[in-house]
Amino acid sequence: MMPLSPQLQQHWQTVADRLPADFPIAELSPQARSVMAFSDFVEQSVIAQPGWLNELADSSPEAEEWRHYEAWLQDRLQAVTDEAGLMRELRLFRRQMMVRIAWAQALSLVSEEETLQQLSALAETLIVAARDWLYAACCKEWGTPCNAEGQPQPLLILGMGKLGGGELNFSSDIDLIFAWPEHGATRGGRRELDNAQFFTRLGQRLIKALDQPTQDGFVYRVDMRLRPFGDSGPLVLSFAALEDYYQEQGRDWERYAMVKARIMGDNDGVYASELRAMLRPFVFRRYIDFSVIQSLRNMKGMIAREVRRRGLKDNIKLGAGGIREIEFIVQVFQLIRGGREPALQQRALLPTLAAIDELHLLPEGDAALLREAYLFLRRLENLLQSINDEQTQTLPQDELNRARLAWGMHTEDWETLSAQLASQMANVRRVFNELIGDDEDQSPDEQLAEYWRELWQDALEEDDASPALAHLNDTDRRSVLALIADFRKELDRRTIGPRGRQVLDQLMPHLLSEICSRADAPLPLARITPLLTGIVTRTTYLELLSEFPGALKHLITLCAASPMVASQLARHPLLLDELLDPNTLYQPTATDAYRDELRQYLLRVPEEDEEQQLEALRQFKQAQQLHIAAADIAGTLPVMKVSDHLTWLAEAILDAVVQQAWGQMVARYGQPTHLHDRQGRGFAVVGYGKLGGWELGYSSDLDLVFLHDCPAEVMTDGEREIDGRQFYLRLAQRIMHLFSTRTSSGILYEVDARLRPSGAAGMLVTTADAFADYQQNEAWTWEHQALVRARVVYGDPALQARFDAIRRDILTTPREGTTLQTEVREMREKMRAHLGNKHPDRFDIKADAGGITDIEFITQYLVLRYASDKPKLTRWSDNVRILELLAQNDIMDEEEARALTHAYTTLRDALHHLALQEQPGHVAPEAFSRERQQVSASWQKWLMA
């Protein structure tokens, strides 16, 4: 034993001074004093448990004592009757054994390899004992889990990383994966559980027993993130689920991790052998796999960047020439050649390194240098951690802990130790660079590109200072990192093949560089990640965005401008094809060309395939709406033109739907016989509301009324003849069905037919004569108001002319001014009471006083009031042109008409852009004050005077 340095002797005196009065200090041997001066962990432990000192004196730690751990622990667990007792005994046993290991290590009673063996064996003993005790307890509670043949099913635990390799460090956490063999259910318990439930509950209890801090501390920090799907995956998986995951989705890093996987406890059972056989092909390839080098180089680059980013100086694990680089060197040969060289299929590093040397895979002498460096670094790491039982690999900055490490490493002082350490790490670094290479000599552009890869692949934390996000404020930077982290977690729940992962890893750095260079980075990122989540299993779409940078830029621009567009793309990724050509993306179809475009589009689909026809209609609508929205966002279409395009689109789709419904009805029943000697179908569709008024928005529904001119005695001419009027009723029902059927692309439009005569209680389809009679004799004033905004959007010219005449006759009927004024005003007040603003501290652009509905009521009132004298007022069905007519016919002065038109278009523009943002139609209470004052003044003038 090396004598204590003056500084450590002085520290021992400090320790002695703070020992309890009844502590047997006089009985302490020089070895005990040295270890207590070296390790605060040992000092605190033996103060709490003085009896442990006696055991150390009576039975000095030995290299092979790990073989007794299981028996020693079982003796302690004999009397345990509940989980609290189990947790206490596990913690006390772990602490006592760790004191013995720290003692032996500090005094060099055992070799470094033997220390690693003891630490790993202790962890395995504690894990297996806890599992077995809890398994028995769970079986007592719920019965024994069995397969279909009644054979009991065990919980198998894979120890990963250093635990699996038998190289656990002093204060390590433990990486575990839980598995059970076959599906089934419990038998013999008070309550039956399926095996998945049983093992999940057992796994949760096991983690709690090991990980939960109590007054006695904890056993080990348990990390389950290496399991399939990480934190978002099931806690325990069946063998079948494990095999499916690793065959279909296993990633490079999971393959590397599985090299060290070892089954805890019984390694010779049937199920253990089955699990090992299942995993071996995933880990060790039959062919020589040189792609491993680049993958490991990428991983090493990621770690090097993490060291730089976090300022991890003096890190003996992650730093240049550290423990991780030795592990990488060994893994390169295991993964490249392990499938062909069984000697390389070992979990522990040092035996594998010896096999590498025997196979002459490294230059002469390099394996010996790596072995020496590994043992040096692992001893230094374990000594460092045993000072405070603290998980750290960063060398201390304070003089006391430096003196402790110099003593533990048998050097005169810290400077000597530092020189030895530098020499060892330089040797490792040289071998690593010669084998794997490095990524540190990068140009500024390469470094920036690396930062984007880092941002995607390294799961950065909030305090990581990446130049890529330097321009964002703290809040936005945190938002970006959180969005990326959430997206990665979501990906873990998805079944993504290796090709999909590869394309995604190519795409994401480019996408992040485009998004994060924007000042509003969190906004488009939050909107695009749901889209990406939806397409990650469809590699074609990922490749489209990866291979066409222009499409990616357009996607970001559109999603940043409108969550509505982002949502539409997320729901219907087929629309991504529309992003490929910017010349067409921002150029909507000409208003008079929608019908022809749709006809051409439907030619791609078999006419007899109703399902594909429905799908094609919906896809056409979505693609055209995307073009309209893109032009809208780009500012090339004013709001009135946007509505024109949306209205023309709706009419084209209505035309196609009627044709489709007509064809289906005629195929079934034939056509009504009154059509034999005439052109057309004797059918018309009247558009009301926004459709009738050329004011459709992106999510507007269609207000429709159906008319026909079929005489009462007519039948159809098909084999299954039906009454002609019944034919038109079923035709209208079929049209409604085609609009509202929900396919994978959603519905076409919501259709509302309640504006028909007698509303929901009336016939769905009426004759033109019945419609005229209802309007003349039964309709309410509000129904005549609605007629102002009605026009035929599909139908025979003769029937259209008949409707126009009915509308003109009704609207030009003389009305008593005061009565009309009262009825219109009362209807508006009733609407406001029923539909008024639910947010009193906001202004509802449509429903509140001074809003859009008031303007509509003013124009409708004035048409009904003055059309008897000025029939030209009935010409148009949209508010803007009605206001023009009112001015041209000297009913409203031009200044007021212009002011109301300005207010109307301004408010509609605002409502329209709120819809693009998926925002409700209410704004700050002071908004649009000038426009509202104008509307209120006109309301007062026309409807209150």
Swiss-Prot record:
Its EC number is 2.7.7.89, 2.7.7.42. It is an enzyme of class 2 (transferase). One of its GO terms (biological process) is regulation of glutamine family amino acid metabolic process. The keyword Signal does not apply. Pfam families: GlnD_UR_UTase, GlnE. Residues 1-440 are annotated as: Adenylyl removase. GO terms for cellular component: cytosol. Keywords: ATP-binding, Magnesium, Multifunctional enzyme, Nucleotide-binding, Nucleotidyltransferase, Transferase. InterPro entries: GlnE, GlnE_rpt_dom, NT_sf, PII_UdlTrfase/GS_AdlTrfase. Residues 449-945 are annotated as: Adenylyl transferase. One of its GO terms (molecular function) is [glutamine synthetase]-adenylyl-L-tyrosine phosphorylase activity. It catalyses: [glutamine synthetase]-O(4)-(5'-adenylyl)-L-tyrosine + phosphate = [glutamine synthetase]-L-tyrosine + ADP; [glutamine synthetase]-L-tyrosine + ATP = [glutamine synthetase]-O(4)-(5'-adenylyl)-L-tyrosine + diphosphate. Its cofactor is Mg(2+). NCBIfam families: PRK11072.1 (NF008292). Involved in the regulation of glutamine synthetase GlnA, a key enzyme in the process to assimilate ammonia. When cellular nitrogen levels are high, the C-terminal adenylyl transferase (AT) inactivates GlnA by covalent transfer of an adenylyl group from ATP to specific tyrosine residue of GlnA, thus reducing its activity. Conversely, when nitrogen levels are low, the N-terminal adenylyl removase (AR) activates GlnA by removing the adenylyl group by phosphorolysis, increasing its activity. Belongs to the GlnE family. This is Bifunctional glutamine synthetase adenylyltransferase/adenylyl-removing enzyme. It comes from Klebsiella pneumoniae (strain 342). The lineage of its organism: Bacteria, Pseudomonadati, Pseudomonadota, Gammaproteobacteria, Enterobacterales.
